[in-house]
Amino acid sequence: MEQQSHKVLVVDDDVRLRQLLERYLRDQGFGARAVDGAEAMDRAMAREHYDLLVLDLMMPGEDGLAICRRLRGTKSDVPIIMLTAKGDDVDRIVGLELGADDYLPKPFNPRELVARINAVMRRRAA
């Protein structure tokens, strides 16, 4: 599988979705970890390198757009896929303008998330 070496960090405040995504991504061959917000993400990223973030837009505290803005402001080039219930055009456009690499509205098919992760990683490798 092409994704076996990719380490993915999922950042979402929904515990059931975090568990589902972590398990599904691992089953698909990714090195996956899931955390509940910005502080846990910062701790995880300080300890380990991640190849891609799956980032929820609406979270308590620092939301996904603020996290994306902060990461891009520090020149972090880690690919970001926004995964969120906010699916209207304005939210998608703002997320992409702030530096997200892709955007997937909830509800979603986990296979589509895997396909999008692989597509982002292929583009980064090119």
Regions found by a protein language model. Give the residues of each.
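The feature encodes the CheY-like receiver
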Residues: 18, 60, 74, 88, ...
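Short amphipathic alpha-helix used as the core "switch/output" element in two-component signaling
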Residues: 65-76
